[in-house]
From Swiss-Prot:
Cystine connections: none
CC per GO annotation: cytosol
Keyword Hydrolase assigned: no
The name this protein goes by in its record: Ribosome maturation factor RimP
Length: 159
Protein backbone atom coordinates (compact mmCIF):
# COMPACT_ATOMS: atom_id res chain seq x y z
CA UNK A 1 0.00 0.00 0.00
CA UNK A 2 1.31 3.45 -0.96
CA UNK A 3 2.18 5.98 1.76
CA UNK A 4 -0.64 8.34 0.72
CA UNK A 5 -3.15 5.46 0.79
CA UNK A 6 -2.01 4.53 4.31
CA UNK A 7 -2.37 8.13 5.49
CA UNK A 8 -5.89 8.29 4.03
CA UNK A 9 -6.99 5.04 5.69
CA UNK A 10 -5.40 6.11 8.97
CA UNK A 11 -7.25 9.42 8.85
CA UNK A 12 -10.59 7.61 8.54
CA UNK A 13 -9.80 5.19 11.39
CA UNK A 14 -8.34 7.91 13.62
CA UNK A 15 -11.39 10.17 13.20
CA UNK A 16 -13.58 7.32 14.51
CA UNK A 17 -11.40 7.08 17.63
CA UNK A 18 -10.88 10.81 18.20
CA UNK A 19 -14.25 12.41 17.50
CA UNK A 20 -16.19 10.69 20.34
CA UNK A 21 -13.46 11.85 22.76
CA UNK A 22 -13.69 15.48 21.62
CA UNK A 23 -10.25 15.29 20.02
CA UNK A 24 -9.18 16.65 16.64
CA UNK A 25 -6.83 15.04 14.15
CA UNK A 26 -4.47 17.80 13.05
CA UNK A 27 -2.10 15.88 10.80
CA UNK A 28 -1.00 12.36 9.81
CA UNK A 29 2.54 11.52 8.71
CA UNK A 30 3.60 8.13 7.41
CA UNK A 31 7.23 8.15 6.38
CA UNK A 32 10.53 6.35 6.52
CA UNK A 33 12.96 7.46 9.19
CA UNK A 34 16.20 5.57 8.91
CA UNK A 35 15.30 1.92 8.35
CA UNK A 36 11.87 2.10 9.96
CA UNK A 37 8.49 3.44 8.91
CA UNK A 38 6.89 5.85 11.39
CA UNK A 39 3.17 6.54 11.61
CA UNK A 40 2.80 9.84 13.45
CA UNK A 41 -0.51 11.41 14.41
CA UNK A 42 -0.80 14.93 15.75
CA UNK A 43 -3.95 15.41 17.83
CA UNK A 44 -5.38 18.33 19.75
CA UNK A 45 -8.40 19.54 21.70
CA UNK A 46 -9.60 22.86 23.09
CA UNK A 47 -7.39 23.73 26.04
CA UNK A 48 -4.60 21.46 24.81
CA UNK A 49 -3.95 17.75 24.85
CA UNK A 50 -2.32 15.85 27.71
CA UNK A 51 0.16 13.01 27.74
CA UNK A 52 -2.61 10.76 29.09
CA UNK A 53 -4.81 11.70 26.11
CA UNK A 54 -2.01 10.78 23.70
CA UNK A 55 -1.37 7.46 25.46
CA UNK A 56 -5.08 6.55 25.42
CA UNK A 57 -5.39 7.34 21.71
CA UNK A 58 -2.22 5.38 20.97
CA UNK A 59 -3.53 2.29 22.79
CA UNK A 60 -6.97 2.39 21.18
CA UNK A 61 -5.67 3.11 17.70
CA UNK A 62 -2.99 0.43 18.00
CA UNK A 63 -5.64 -2.20 18.82
CA UNK A 64 -7.74 -1.22 15.81
CA UNK A 65 -4.76 -1.14 13.46
CA UNK A 66 -3.66 -4.59 14.66
CA UNK A 67 -7.11 -5.98 13.79
CA UNK A 68 -7.50 -4.16 10.45
CA UNK A 69 -3.89 -5.00 9.50
CA UNK A 70 -3.74 -2.95 6.29
CA UNK A 71 -0.19 -1.72 6.93
CA UNK A 72 1.97 -4.57 5.70
CA UNK A 73 5.37 -3.41 6.91
CA UNK A 74 6.61 -2.89 10.45
CA UNK A 75 6.13 0.63 11.76
CA UNK A 76 6.26 2.68 14.94
CA UNK A 77 3.08 4.46 16.02
CA UNK A 78 3.51 7.88 17.63
CA UNK A 79 0.70 10.10 18.91
CA UNK A 80 1.66 13.65 19.84
CA UNK A 81 0.39 17.18 20.29
CA UNK A 82 0.94 19.49 17.31
CA UNK A 83 3.29 21.62 19.43
CA UNK A 84 3.84 25.36 19.57
CA UNK A 85 4.22 25.66 15.79
CA UNK A 86 0.90 23.93 15.13
CA UNK A 87 0.12 23.62 11.41
CA UNK A 88 -3.01 25.29 10.08
CA UNK A 89 -4.67 22.65 7.91
CA UNK A 90 -8.41 23.28 7.96
CA UNK A 91 -10.39 26.39 7.07
CA UNK A 92 -11.65 26.53 10.67
CA UNK A 93 -8.03 26.85 11.88
CA UNK A 94 -7.75 30.25 10.18
CA UNK A 95 -10.70 31.53 12.21
CA UNK A 96 -9.79 29.79 15.48
CA UNK A 97 -6.30 31.27 15.56
CA UNK A 98 -7.16 34.81 14.41
CA UNK A 99 -4.94 37.31 16.20
CA UNK A 100 -2.04 34.87 16.51
CA UNK A 101 1.33 35.15 14.79
CA UNK A 102 1.56 32.81 11.79
CA UNK A 103 4.04 31.97 9.07
CA UNK A 104 2.60 31.19 5.65
CA UNK A 105 4.58 29.72 2.76
CA UNK A 106 3.07 29.80 -0.72
CA UNK A 107 3.60 27.63 -3.78
CA UNK A 108 4.55 30.65 -5.86
CA UNK A 109 5.65 34.27 -5.46
CA UNK A 110 2.77 36.52 -4.39
CA UNK A 111 2.67 40.29 -3.92
CA UNK A 112 1.92 41.96 -0.60
CA UNK A 113 -0.03 45.25 -0.33
CA UNK A 114 3.03 47.25 -1.46
CA UNK A 115 3.80 45.02 -4.43
CA UNK A 116 6.74 43.18 -2.86
CA UNK A 117 6.79 39.61 -4.18
CA UNK A 118 7.59 36.79 -1.78
CA UNK A 119 6.80 33.20 -0.89
CA UNK A 120 7.02 33.53 2.91
CA UNK A 121 4.74 35.79 4.93
CA UNK A 122 4.99 36.40 8.69
CA UNK A 123 2.24 38.29 10.45
CA UNK A 124 -0.81 38.35 12.67
CA UNK A 125 -3.66 36.29 11.30
CA UNK A 126 -6.73 38.41 10.63
CA UNK A 127 -8.83 35.51 9.38
CA UNK A 128 -10.27 33.74 6.34
CA UNK A 129 -12.98 35.14 4.11
CA UNK A 130 -14.12 33.91 0.69
CA UNK A 131 -11.15 31.56 0.40
CA UNK A 132 -8.58 34.28 1.14
CA UNK A 133 -6.37 34.37 4.25
CA UNK A 134 -5.54 37.88 5.48
CA UNK A 135 -2.45 38.70 7.54
CA UNK A 136 -1.21 41.94 9.04
CA UNK A 137 2.48 41.63 8.25
CA UNK A 138 5.22 42.60 10.68
CA UNK A 139 5.97 45.59 8.43
CA UNK A 140 2.39 46.83 8.93
CA UNK A 141 0.85 46.17 5.53
CA UNK A 142 -1.81 43.58 4.75
CA UNK A 143 -1.28 40.42 2.75
CA UNK A 144 -4.20 38.60 1.18
CA UNK A 145 -3.31 35.04 0.27
CA UNK A 146 -5.68 32.69 -1.57
CA UNK A 147 -6.08 29.49 0.43
CA UNK A 148 -5.29 27.35 -2.63
CA UNK A 149 -1.89 29.09 -2.98
CA UNK A 150 -0.77 28.13 0.55
CA UNK A 151 1.81 25.34 0.64
CA UNK A 152 2.21 25.42 4.42
CA UNK A 153 0.96 27.56 7.28
CA UNK A 154 1.72 27.29 10.97
CA UNK A 155 1.50 29.18 14.23
CA UNK A 156 4.71 30.87 15.30
CA UNK A 157 5.81 31.15 18.89
CA UNK A 158 6.48 34.73 20.00
CA UNK A 159 9.34 35.26 22.45
Amino acid sequence: MQKDDVAGRITAVAEQVLTPQGLELVEVEYKREGRQMVLRLFVDKPGGISLDDCAAVSRELSEILDVEDFIRENYTLEVSSPGLNRPLKKEADYERYAGRLVKVRTFELLADEEGNRRKTFLGDLVGLSDGVVTLTLREGQLARIPLDKIAKANLEFEF
